Amino acid sequence: MASRILMNIKEEVTCPICLELLTEPLSLDCGHSFCQACITANHKKSMLHQGERSCPLCRISYPSENLRPNRHLANIVERLREVMLSPEEGQKVDHCARHGEKLLLFCQQDGNVICWLCERSQEHRGHHTLLVEEVAQTYRENLQVALETMRQKQQDAEKLEADVREEQASWKIQIRDDKTNIMAEFKQLRDILDCEESNELQILEKEEKNILKRLTQSENDMVLQTQSMGVLISDLEHRLQGSVMELLQGVDEVIKRVKNVTLQKPKTFLNEKRRVFRAPDLKGMLQVFKELTEVQRYWVHVTLVPSHLSCAVISEDERQVRYQERIHQSFGKVKYFYGVLGSPSIRSGKHYWEVDVSNKSAWILGVCVSLKCTANRNGPRIENYQPKNGYWVIGLWNAGNYSAFQDSVKYSDFQDGSHSATYGPLIVPLFMTICPNRVGVFLDYEACTVSFFNVTSNGFLIYKFSNCRFSDSVFPYFSPMTCELPMTLCSPRS
């Protein structure tokens, strides 16, 4: 009986983690107790959130600071160790609690150690028994295998637990990124609508200002007409009310003035055909926005390559170029410009970059195979800006003429009385409702296309070169022309 009670007490003070008697026991809020080393090692595995952990047995969460030493339990363990190590108790453990005989046999049916009197009792009659020494090694090996199996299963369980936590963290990151992308895209859509609204209001305000100005002028004309008539009426009234001499003096001139008076009617604008506002094609705008977003996925970092032949000043970070007039030894003071190339060179793939051309009155940009423009006393020549010469570019001339440069057309040129045929580029006019401050360039080497986008106008396509013949590497191309304001390469976040 005493041994059974002792075993029950031992079970109560055994650590559920290491299955040994508790060492420096710590108790949780749920009432369970563990060795200090065991529960501390378990902290990392049972981390929940914000410093909270869970009990390995009941999974109830608890704050880290609520771990408290259990002195009473530690005293019980200490007393139990003393009892188990005493010779008397050791003798009691080795002897049958019922008969007092030594436990030398093992009953295979019941799985317990018994004494020789137990073997002969009615309870164990007919059971197969063996000496404890004979079965101890076998069961020790079986238990060792079972222990290894459980340890492996525990490792597998811990790995599964870690996998779940990792998947949970991964999902949180994905959802967070999706939220960020959704918010960013809807913000861009709202920006597009705000921009369209602002443009429409500016057009309306401009129309209002123009009409009111004309109406004000018309009103002033009517006031002058009324005042002129009032003066003439006063003259007539004075003559009628005065003497005969006053009546007849210059009367023919007055009558002539009255006959020449023509009532000028004010010009009205009610019947003028006004532009009717139509809501923007949201579907089309979204499609344009989608196309711009798609090509922006291929944004590359482009830098400018300095050239000693170019009258260009490139910034230290090689991201900005502006025109600077220089003195050439052969020509004297001559405005000449070759343009500058961008790096890297492109032999394959899809590439996108953006250029800020704000407030510039002239510029040319795109891609080219090499620099072929020739110096000219009158400024940069455009004869070579043609696809067949390796240039796929668009540009701005005279602060308002946007053009794309296609392959040459033949035209006649008369110089010094002689006739010659010149081949200039086919200049394709480009019409834009909103002038671009920022131009996007997209090169698809395999598709043989170069596209230009008006980023200022929500990414609408400006022009597209198709069936381009890229026989070799091509480079980004930039020419600020003779306008001293800079061209600046943009970054994705600018």
Swiss-Prot record:
SUPFAM superfamilies: B-box zinc-binding domain, Concanavalin A-like lectins/glucanases, RING/U-box. Residues 280-494 form the B30.2/SPRY domain. It comes from the Eukaryota. Residues 132-222 form a coiled coil. InterPro entries: B30.2/SPRY (IPR001870), B30.2/SPRY_sf (IPR043136), Butyrophylin_SPRY (IPR003879), ConA-like_dom_sf (IPR013320), SPRY_dom (IPR003877), TRIM/RBCC (IPR050143), Znf-RING_euk (IPR027370), Znf_B-box (IPR000315). Pathway: Protein modification; protein ubiquitination. Disulfide bonds: none annotated. The modification N-acetylalanine is found at A2. One of its GO terms (molecular function) is zinc ion binding. Keywords: Acetylation, Antiviral defense, Autophagy, Coiled coil, Cytoplasm, Immunity, Innate immunity, Metal-binding, Nucleus, Phosphoprotein, Transferase, Ubl conjugation, Ubl conjugation pathway, Zinc, Zinc-finger. Degraded in a proteasome-independent fashion in the absence of viral infection but in a proteasome-dependent fashion following exposure to restriction sensitive virus. Autoubiquitinated in a RING finger- and UBE2D2-dependent manner. Monoubiquitinated by TRIM21. Deubiquitinated by Yersinia YopJ. Ubiquitination may not lead to proteasomal degradation. Zn(2+) binds at C96, H99, C118, H124. The B box-type zinc finger domain and the coiled-coil domain contribute to the higher and low order multimerization respectively which is essential for restriction activity. The coiled coil domain is important for higher order multimerization by promoting the initial dimerization. Capsid-specific restriction factor that prevents infection from non-host-adapted retroviruses. Blocks viral replication early in the life cycle, after viral entry but before reverse transcription. In addition to acting as a capsid-specific restriction factor, also acts as a pattern recognition receptor that activates innate immune signaling in response to the retroviral capsid lattice. Can form homodimers and homotrimers. In addition to lower-order dimerization, also exhibits a higher-order multimerization and both low- and high-order multimerizations are essential for its restriction activity. Interacts with BTBD1 and BTBD2. Interacts with PSMC4, PSMC5, PSMD7 and HSPA8/HSC70. Interacts (via B30.2/SPRY domain) with HSPA1A/B. Interacts with PSMC2, MAP3K7/TAK1, TAB2 and TAB3. Interacts with SQSTM1. Interacts with TRIM6 and TRIM34. Interacts with ULK1 (phosphorylated form), GABARAP, GABARAPL1, GABARAPL2, MAP1LC3A, MAP1LC3C and BECN1. This is Tripartite motif-containing protein 5. It comes from Pithecia pithecia (White-faced saki).
